[in-house]
């Protein structure tokens, strides 16, 4: 299948490629390439608007020299792996100010650029939105089924048991089916092992409060 045939199929055009005369093929091919790129950019803007990513951040913008204990190789290995297709999870653990949210947001942006619906939200905002929703079950279902979910700042506030149960319900529904990224300042109970996640510890001292264990037991 040549470029013209591929683009006609991608854009759901009904005209067969063999019915396009040779002198018209080049300008039509140029137009189809432009249309394909326009649709791709439009999709990215739409996914970004729906994702909750407030400011676009990339891994290239991250200051890897700020803390040399953060493994750039580990992060890039994860990003370049089929983590979305294979539902690989990721837990970023470390103290406040080490860049966990930046890295998580950048990984979410990579998913958006690849055309995947993504939700990036703090744990506090997630449970708040569920509480305020007209149909909480429907909102839980959305976060359980969105292609890529990032729960930021898990453990920065103490949740009620019902909130913890809600977070656990979402994570357990996604486990081994859809990829989940979690950032937290808590290191207790090996949470990455509880839901089959890659663990990257961004060190400068981490809290050892027990709250997070409730989510992964």
Model-found features: residue ranges?
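Conserved hydrophobic/aromatic pocket- or pore-lining residues that grip, position, or stack substrates
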Residues: 62, 104, 122
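Residue-level preference for the first positions of well-ordered beta-strands
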Residues: 89-91, 148, 179
């Amino acid at each position: 299948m040549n470029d013209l045939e591929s683009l006609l199929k991608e854009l759901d055009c009904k005209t067969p490629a063999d019915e396009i005369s040779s002198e018209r093929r080049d300008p039509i091919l140029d137009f189809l390439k432009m249309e394909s790129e326009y649709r791709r950019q439009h999709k990215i803007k739409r996914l970004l608007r729906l994702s909750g990513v407030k400011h676009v951040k990339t891994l290239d913008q991250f200051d890897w020299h700020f803390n040399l204990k953060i493994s750039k190789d580990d992060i890039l290995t994860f990003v370049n792996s089929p983590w979305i297709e294979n539902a690989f999870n990721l837990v970023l653990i470390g103290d406040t100010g080490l860049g966990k949210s930046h890295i998580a947001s950048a990984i979410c942006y990579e998913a958006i650029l690849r055309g995947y619906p993504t939700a990036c939200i703090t744990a506090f905002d997630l449970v708040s939105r569920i509480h305020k929703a007209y149909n909480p079950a429907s909102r839980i279902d959305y976060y359980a089924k969105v292609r890529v979910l990032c729960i930021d700042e898990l453990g920065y506030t103490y949740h009620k048991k019902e909130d913890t149960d809600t977070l656990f319900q979402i994570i357990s529904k996604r486990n081994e089916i859809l990829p989940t990224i979690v950032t937290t300042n808590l290191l207790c109970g090996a949470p990455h092992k509880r839901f089959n996640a890659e663990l990257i510890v961004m060190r400068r001292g981490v809290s050892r409060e027990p709250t997070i264990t409730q989510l992964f037991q």
